[in-house]
Every structure is written in structure tokens, then in C-alpha cells.
UniProtKB/Swiss-Prot annotation:
HAMAP family on file: MscL
Biological process, per Gene Ontology: monoatomic ion transport
Listed name of the protein: Large-conductance mechanosensitive channel
Residues annotated as transmembrane: 14-34, 81-101
Cellular location(s): Cell membrane
Amino acid sequence: MIKEFREFISRGNVIDLAVGVIVGAAFTAIINSLVNDIINPLIGLLVGGRADFSNYFIPLAGQTATTLAEAQAAGPVLAYGSFLTAVINFLLIAFVVFMIVRTVNRMRSKPEAVPPAPPEPTPSERLLAEIRDLLARQG
């Protein structure tokens, strides 16, 4: 059983998947930082304030609170700001993955080989073509 497990783990696909998961986790942290530390402040600059979507919420029980944590402690809350941040993160990750896949596909695709020009006919072939043409004209 240990031997089978070792063979399973040593297959390329499993190792590639593990590397992909680890890189994906690290990439998620980078995207979160990009959204929270760069994109949201730029949006805040454009709309004239701080674009902190994490505190955008609608209390469902009618309570009032200034932060999402306070509102969640007081009762049910629609935290649409957190959802908006997750959507922005997803769109950024999807775009970056699309660009990576697109680049890899372009690198993989080989330009179509141009077929070589047909070789010049040999003197014998030219002579045979002339004989054929003469016979065709005669009837």
C-alpha cells in the first residue's frame, strides 16, 4: 500500500496539482493585497473618499452599527461590501489566469509550416510535357 501511495504521489499530475494549489494560495494573497491596498484606494480617490467596501452592509434586523463586525454581532446582516470585494478579486484572478493561459497557448502554437515550392521540372519532364502537348494538338 505504501508503494502504491508513493507511485501515486510521484506521478507528474499530482505534483503539478500540488504546486498549482500552493502557487494559487500565494497568488490569492497577492490579489487581495492588490485590491485592498491599490485598487480600492484608487477607487476612493476617484469617488472622493475611502473605498472600503468591507463596511458596506445592510442590517436585516433594523439595528444600527458603524462597522460590519458590530452589525454581525447585533443580528443578521447582508454584507454586500465583502461580496463586492470578492467579486473584484475573482475578476482580477480570472483576468490574470486568462492572460497566462493565452500567453502559454501562443508560445505552444507553432507557426504553420509554409509548404516548399514545387521543384523545377527536369529536362526529361519538360520533354515529355512537350510531347504530350503536341499529341494533344494533333488529335
